[in-house]
Amino acid sequence: MSVQLLDKTRKINKLLHNNNSHKVVFNDICDVLSDILKSNVLVISKKGKVLGIKNREDIPEIHELIEDKVGLLIDSMLNERLLLVLSTKENVNLTTLGFDSDNIEKYQGLLLPIDIAGERLGTLFLYKLDAQYDIDDIILGEYGTTVVGLEMMRSVNEENAEETRK
């Protein structure tokens, strides 16, 4: 294992260990993943709601089909395509997801289903311009997906506990 991979893994770990509120905010994990994977990052719920987002200044945003604000819904057909992805897909041609804006062929996507305890909770969607994802990127993406999935489960459990108390 390379030292760089270990260092990047530790950056993700810090989200879990250095958090006083005991909650990982989805934008925080997007910030970290964007930094270490040099990508624009979205956390999307199973229903298509944007839970977290980070766009880098050096990568032009794709506005087509994607809402770039937390709480808004992405295009329903795009969400259906994302939910059909059952395992990590790297270096995805974004035209296969329905994007057709100018220069879209220059982008590469990394699609990571968020599955915890056999339940699909959403998708981690990353993309970058003029570069491919390598094996280290995939490892870090999958690790980040685990952190996001655990936080999603914690959020669901807290909501259920609150409803039970009412």
Descriptions of predicted regions:
Residues 1-166:
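Hydrophobic, helix-rich cores of sensory/ligand-binding and other regulatory modules
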